[in-house]
UniProtKB/Swiss-Prot annotation:
This is Chitin synthase 1. The chain crosses the membrane at residues 594-614, 630-650, 668-688, 713-733, 742-762, 843-863, 887-919. Its EC number is 2.4.1.16. The lineage of its organism: Eukaryota, Fungi, Dikarya, Basidiomycota, Ustilaginomycotina. Belongs to the chitin synthase family. Class III subfamily. It holds the Pfam family Chitin_synth_1N. It is a multi-pass membrane protein. It is found in: Cell membrane; Cytoplasmic vesicle membrane. InterPro entries: Chitin_synth (IPR004835), Chitin_synth_fun (IPR004834), Chitin_synth_N (IPR013616), Nucleotide-diphossugar_trans (IPR029044). CDD domains: Chitin_synth_C. One of its GO terms (biological process) is cell wall organization.
């Protein structure tokens, strides 16, 4: 088989495919003489050698329910495939061998509890009996073994394509036959029969057509791309990726089968089905951090295969491994395999996938450089959608995003509503999750609509947002990619090597930089908006340590980016925005400056609010109570203040020297303490407000109460807190978070300032640009060309895997992909350094506590004296404090005298014995 470069213009794909078929040196099928529609035959007898998931098959029942799924295996991680006699006719078809039955039902059943695989109606053992352990797919050793070259097969010589390793590999028979006949029949390309692998040995900026690189969708098939959906991945588990990928595929189905959209309906009528204008790109940030079970999931749908990646090509390191395939299979989060069924309107449509697996971990900005500068340059999409692995797009969410751009030619970027994954409310039991859920909700109800009204949304979350591809070309992407550490040497002073710590922090919130640069782009008038109907569900941190680490990056990045946008606001005048838009952008800039100012002083404002409000309790609410009651609440308030100050100081001690994961108990205790103090503050505030309102009802003087210095501000604050939140939530028909999450938020809110802000600012130096090595890539084989003659181009000898071997390997892949998922409980034990820092922190905390207690005790030695005048109180306080200082001074004198006595004795002793010293 010839492996020439796919260097061609749009429209040449069919001619090239015809050439390739004429040059084939081997047959794809096991039986090359098989007539169309005839079942495959296995020359060796026994089980047939291929699956026939073909809708033309008479046993392919159309009446089956949509989205039949493969049942999960047993909890032990083993799986066995058996026939279902009550559903599947006993035929010589090979469907059962691959887990797909002729009538559309899946045959993936529970393993036998006896330890032996159950027998099949044919009398033999199940071919899907898995001998792999439950930890196999997570094992780096097992994955490394699967990357080795096959031990048997035909050896073929492959010529590199302009020096590049670009090879088409046959997909498993079951995957190939899962495609509906209306898509596969008449398709003369290898789109559904082969997966294309490219070992990209270049920087993403050099992945161009001129350099010999190409993509099947654009160069071979000549298709134009309307929608490029990018899923960025780091180390999420297979269930999180399945949530995202399956949600995306459901959205693509809804777009392609939408009857309300004239654009997509007209495209289908013109012979260009909607799925041919949509590409899904999965970009993985390194082999090392990648969960290997995720690769099994991708192999199940056909877009990845073990044993095909190459670490080097002629001595050049592979930078990224690209896999291309169009699949109609999916795995849902159950996990279960989703396959099409004949004439079922709810079937998934084929999805063009490009899987980009970077060899080394080089961070998210670099992943986006592969998206925009490499893949996007070839595909030239109208719209790019960015989704983080773990974010589940809601029903028709991608359509609503696309619709917003389609109806507004000046729209450069948009985002949907991101809400926390609460699992039907079960996760709201965790107050941290509930508080974050409330934050997300109110941001989507108050903040995003406000910014969208101005035309500038300060941040389009990278977890779920979209950009017009041509809008971000030029300066927006150039500024954005200055944060890519792989460009640091090339950019020099403009890159990371030339940045100060403040600028580096700015790129922790890189999406904010892209938003500002897009709106301020010279000569254009791009706007940003919020699309309320487009919803995405994401998981949020459930532990204190994880939340603190996440918010460090968010807070430091957003703070630096906010300063950047305000300082460079004048660049907005170079844009082509109208006078009205500029006026509103000025108002928004003023608003952002005020918000930034308040966030800067949030620490002091919270302490002053707490200390002043709780003093109203004895001064205003209990002023007519007994002396004993006043004394009790005086000391309660004093204790509350001391505890507040101590735990606030403790946050600085922790933040300056400890990892959150190394001090989990202390941070949890801090959240609890600040939560209790926050409840006390709310209790006093509500009591004071209620008392004022009761007095108003008696006196009838409403205006005096509202503008009273003591209670007026409290009433206004509570109205803003409770009233505006509630009214806005009801207005948007989404009020339930006020019931399920608001109380928890009020408890956690002080910790957001006193813990998260303190930790973030104390770790401003930590920009986390370091990357991990990718030693796992050493398991991959290399490619070196050989030349028989100096005049001939170099070739590579490669063992071609037989189709039976591919299918046999696929069995184990599916069993691992749909096995029951057990989250890995990694108990992170504190390191020796953590233990040392913990001892230091607790010692310093005890030191601060004892010194602070002594200071407070002396300053408040009189306690509360309500029966004395201020002058008498001051005299008593001065007298007692003078006594303390006299004690301190005499003690100091005594210690010094004692030292002097010792010094004197030593002097006398040494000088008196000088004459008797031996020399």
């Amino acid at each position: 088989m010839s492996y020439d470069a796919y260097q061609m213009r749009p429209g040449q794909g069919r001619d090239y495919a015809r050439q390739q078929r004429q040059q084939r040196s081997y047959q794809l099928s096991d039986d090359p003489l098989r007539q169309p529609g005839a079942p495959y035959a296995n020359p060796a007898g026994g089980y047939p050698s291929s699956a026939s998931m073909n809708p033309e098959n008479p046993f392919y029942a159309a009446e089956n329910p949509s989205f039949q799924t493969l049942a999960p295996a047993t909890s032990e991680g083993h799986a066995t495939y058996t026939y279902e006699e009550d559903k599947i006719p006993l035929t010589d078809s090979a469907d059962e061998k691959y887990g797909f039955s002729q009538n559309g039902h899946s045959t993936y059943n529970l393993a036998s509890q006896s330890g032996f695989p159950p027998s099949t109606p044919c009398g033999g053992p199940s071919s899907y009996s898995s001998a792999l352990g439950p930890e196999d797919s997570a094992s780096q050793v097992a994955w490394a073994k699967r990357q080795q070259a096959p031990k048997r097969g035909l050896t073929k010589k492959i010529q590199l394509t302009r020096g590049h390793w670009i090879v088409d590999h046959p997909v498993p028979t079951a995957v190939k036959n899962s495609v509906e006949s209306r898509w596969s029949q008449g398709n003369r390309t290898q789109e559904f029969t082969h997966m294309r692998y490219t070992a990209a040995t270049c920087d993403p900026d050099e992945f161009t057509l001129e350099n010999g690189w190409s993509l099947r969708t654009s160069q071979q098939y000549g298709r134009d791309t309307e929608l490029l959906i990018a899923i960025t991945y780091y180390n999420e588990d297979r269930i999180l990726l399945a949530r995202t990928l399956h949600g995306v595929m459901l959205n693509i189905r809804d777009i392609c089968k939408s009857k309300s959209s004239k654009f997509w309906r007209r495209s289908a009528e013109e012979g260009r089905p909607g799925w041919q204008r949509i590409v899904v790109s999965l970009i993985f940030d390194g082999i090392d951090p990648c969960d290997k079970e995720v690769l099994d999931l991708l192999a199940t749908v056909g877009v990845y295969q073990d044993g095909v990646m190459k670490r080097k090509v002629d001595g050049k390191d592979t930078v990224a491994h690209l896999f291309e395939y169009t699949t109609q299979l999916s795995v849902d989060p159950t996990p279960a395999l989703i396959q099409p069924h004949a004439d079922d309107a709810s079937n998934l449509v084929p999805v063009q996938m490009i899987f980009c697996l970077k060899q080394k971990n080089s961070k998210k900005i670099n992943s986006h450089r592969w998206l925009f500068n490499a893949l996007g340059r070839h595909l030239q999409p109208e719209l790019c959608v960015l989704i983080d692995a773990g974010t589940k797009p809601g029903h028709k969410s991608l359509y609503y995003l696309w619709e917003a751009f389609y109806n507004n030619a000046n729209l450069g970027g948009a985002c949907g509503e991101i809400h926390a994954m609460i699992k039907n409310g079960r996760k709201l039991i965790n107050p941290l999750v509930a508080a974050q859920n409330f934050e997300y909700k109110m941001s989507n109800i108050l903040d995003k609509p406000l910014e969208s009204t101005f035309g500038y949304v300060s941040v389009l979350p990278g977890a779920f947002s979209a950009y017009r591809f041509r809008a971000i070309q030029g300066r927006p992407l150039q500024q954005y990619f200055h944060g890519d550490h792989t460009l640091a040497d090339r950019l020099g002073k403009k890159g990371l090597h030339g940045m100060d710590i403040f600028t580096k922090n700015m790129f922790l919130a890189e999406d904010r930089i892209l938003c500002f640069e897009l709106v301020a782009k010279a000569g254009d008038k791009w706007t940003l908006t919020y699309v309320k109907p487009s919803k995405g569900e994401t998981d949020v941190p459930e532990g204190a340590a994880e939340l603190i680490s996440q918010r460090r990056r968010w807070l430091n990045g957003s703070f630096a980016a906010s300063i950047y946008s305000l300082v460079h606001f004048f660049r907005i005048y170079k844009s082509n925005h109208g006078i009205i838009r500029l006026f509103f952008l000025h108002i928004q800039a003023l608003y952002n400056a005020i918000v930034l100012l308040f966030s800067w002083f949030a620490l002091a404002n919270l302490w002053l609010t707490f200390s002043i409000i709780i003093e109203f309790l004895p001064d205003e609410l209990l002023k007519n109570s007994s002396h004993t009651t006043l004394v009790v609440f005086h000391w309660i308030n004093q204790a509350a203040k001391w505890i507040y100050v101590f735990f606030l100081v403790l946050q600085f001690v922790l933040a300056l020297g400890n990892r959150p994961k190394g001090e989990k108990p202390t941070y949890i205790a801090s959240f609890i303490v600040f939560g209790i103090l926050g409840l006390y503050l709310i209790f006093v505030s509500l009591w004071l407000t209620l008392k004022a309102l009761l007095e108003t009802s008696v006196s009838g003087n409403i205006w005096h109460t509202l503008f009273n210095q003591t209670t007026g501000v409290l009433i206004a604050a509570l109205a803003a807190t409770f009233g505006i939140y509630l009214i806005a939530s009801i207005l948007y028909a989404d009020p339930w978070h006020m019931v399920t999450s608001f109380p928890q938020y009020m408890m956690i809110a002080p910790s957001f300032i006193n813990i998260l802000n303190v930790y973030a600012f104390c770790n401003l130096h930590d920009v986390s640009w370091g990357t991990k090595g990718s030693d796992k890539a050493d398991a991959l084989p290399t490619v070196d060309t050989k030349k028989d003659k100096s005049t001939e181009p170099g070739t590579v000898e490669e063992i071609e895997r037989h189709q039976d071997d591919i299918d046999e390997t696929f069995k184990a892949v599916v069993s691992r992909a749909v096995a029951p998922f057990k989250p890995a409980e990694t108990v992170e034990k504190p390191t020796m350094d953590d233990s040392n820092k913990t001892f230091r922190t607790r010692l310093v905390a005890f030191w601060l506590l004892t010194n602070g207690a002594l200071t407070v005790a002396i300053e408040n030695v009189n306690g509360l004296n309500t029966g004395l005048t201020n002058k008498q109180i001051e005299q008593q306080q001065s007298s007692k404090q003078s006594t303390y200082f006299r004690i301190i001074l005499w003690a100091t004198f005594g210690l010094s005298a004692f030292r002097f006595i010792g010094c004197l004795i030593y002097w006398v002793k040494r000088n008196s014995t000088r004459c008797f010293r031996k020399t």
